UniProtKB/Swiss-Prot annotation:
Residues 1-31, 81-113 are annotated as: Disordered. Associated with the spliceosome. Involved in pre-mRNA splicing. Keywords: Cytoplasm, mRNA processing, mRNA splicing, Nucleus, Spliceosome. InterPro entries: Bud13, CWC26_splicing_factor. The lineage of its organism: Eukaryota, Fungi, Dikarya, Ascomycota, Saccharomycotina. This is Pre-mRNA-splicing factor CWC26. One of its GO terms (biological process) is mRNA splicing, via spliceosome. One of its GO terms (cellular component) is Prp19 complex. Belongs to the CWC26 family. The gene is CWC26. The keyword Nucleus applies. It comes from the Eukaryota.
Length: 270
């Protein structure tokens, strides 16, 4: 006879017994249930008080089981809710240490089922949570995207304006910042030709000089050509103190233009 059978016969529910006068009397049904597996038992550390009335009152509760050795009441919980002891677990869900292949497979499967259950519970009736680059949660995603697009357009426009201003000269920047500005004319052009008093200013007109669009005095004689057509200042003494790069640059440009013209002519001849 197994231990479970013995405990069931000794402490389990009994059949109704006949009394001496022939009438059946009610059998006392025990509230004690015998279980084979200890995994479904969770101890509540109820110390025995020694009072029979307290034990009977606790025994009337549903889902409570009595430990025959310690006389403690335990609560029944399904195996999925039973907390495992504090054991070291690996990332796969298996416990560390020497175990059988069946135990390892069961532990890994249990972790996978828990992950699937949590994912399914999180996906039900849940709204999508949007976050920005810093990790902060976005309350209104549509408004956030609209503001972000507007900020991107403003940033792009700023970069375009900045690059355009970098490629401008002083005159273009001055015109951009002062829309009503007009370039200054030469002093000779400012003199009215139909002015009867112009004949008295012949000597002064001979000494006139040109002005730049910004109103600066320019050199009024011949000066060497440069790539940017920048005239020297009006105080220049006419001595070229450069390293000759401008002359070499113009010579190279002329050589390239002549070579290109020769190639075009040779292609047309064939």
């Amino acid at each position: 006879m197994s231990l479970n059978s013995y405990l069931t016969e000794a402490y389990g529910p009994k059949r109704a017994a006949k009394s001496r006068n022939g009438s059946k009397r009610e059998a006392k049904v025990s509230n004690v249930s015998i279980t084979d597996s200890a995994e479904q038992l969770v101890f509540t550390n109820n110390k025995p008080t020694g009072h029979a009335t307290d034990i009977k009152a606790k025994a009337k509760r549903t889902g409570l089981f009595k430990n025959l050795e310690t006389n403690e009441l335990t609560e029944f919980k399904p195996a999925s809710e039973v907390q495992e002891p504090n054991e070291v677990k690996m990332s796969s869900g298996a416990h560390a240490g020497l175990q059988s292949a069946e135990q390892v497979a069961e532990q890994i499967g249990k972790k996978q089922r828990e992950a699937q259950r949590e994912a399914a519970a999180a996906a039900v009736n849940k709204e999508t949570v949007f976050r920005d680059s810093s990790g902060a949660q976005i309350a209104d995603y549509s408004t956030y995207m609209r503001d972000r697009e507007r900020a991107d357009k403003l940033r792009e426009r700023f970069q375009q304006n900045k690059s355009r201003e970098m490629n401008m000269g002083d005159i273009q920047l001055h015109q951009l910042r002062n829309p009503d500005w007009r370039p200054a004319r030469c002093e000779g052009e400012q003199i009215r030709r139909d002015d009867p008093a112009a004949q008295f200013t012949a000597e002064s007109s001979a000494a006139t000089y040109k002005l730049s669009p910004l109103g600066r005095k320019l050199y009024n004689k011949a000066w060497p050509e440069n790539r940017f057509q920048i005239a020297p200042g009006w105080r220049w003494d006419g001595v070229d103190r450069s390293n000759g790069f401008e002359q070499k640059w113009f010579a190279k440009q002329g050589e390239l233009a002549e070579r290109k013209a020769q190639q075009m002519a040779a292609q047309q001849d064939y």
